[in-house]
Regions:
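Membrane-proximal basic amphipathic "stem/tether" segments
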Residues: 1-32, 36
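Active-site and donor-binding regions of nucleotide-sugar-utilizing enzymes
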Residues: 33-149
């Protein structure tokens, strides 16, 4: 998350613009994006291996956003690719299914996209507007939100 009042204002203002752009870009119903930003680990790693083990890559394109794509060459096969954060915007816009672990983008999904937040330790109070000191920000950036019980 972006630290600092003015940085956060700029971040969310940019997100509003990109959210409007996102509405106009066609979605690929056969594309799954796993957004990690750092290494493929925890929930993202588990989801990735589950999808590959069960053959989802035969029907869907699976794109993983990681910090060092070259570390995952052994997992690359047809319809599976690893990309950097810098090259991820197009895939974020076009994927119907986006899974986020440990990061919240200021871009909102369209009605034609499903975005899942599957952090462990999800900050539910912040996301559900229960912490008023955060200001007038809209934190509803996911279609679904998971939480451990």
């Amino acid at each position: 998350m972006v630290k600092g009042k003015w940085k956060r204002k700029i971040y969310f203002a940019g997100g509003k613009v990109l959210s409007k752009v996102n509405k106009w870009i066609p979605k690929d119903k056969k594309k799954i994006l796993i957004f990690c930003k750092g290494p493929l680990c925890d929930n993202s790693e588990t989801l990735f291996h589950y999808l590959v083990k069960h053959g989802y890559q035969k029907e869907y394109k699976i794109v993983c956003v990681v910090d060092q794509p070259e570390r995952y060459e052994e997992f690359q096969e047809e319809n599976v690719k690893f990309i950097t954060l810098k090259s991820s915007l197009g895939s974020i816009f076009t994927a119907k299914y986006n899974f986020f672990h440990g990061e919240m983008l200021a871009i909102k999904p369209t009605k034609k996209q499903i975005w899942v937040n599957y952090w462990h330790g999800t900050p539910l109070k912040k996301i559900n507007h229960m912490l008023h000191k955060l200001g007038e920000y809209d934190y509803d950036f996911f279609t679904y939100l998971t939480a451990a019980v």
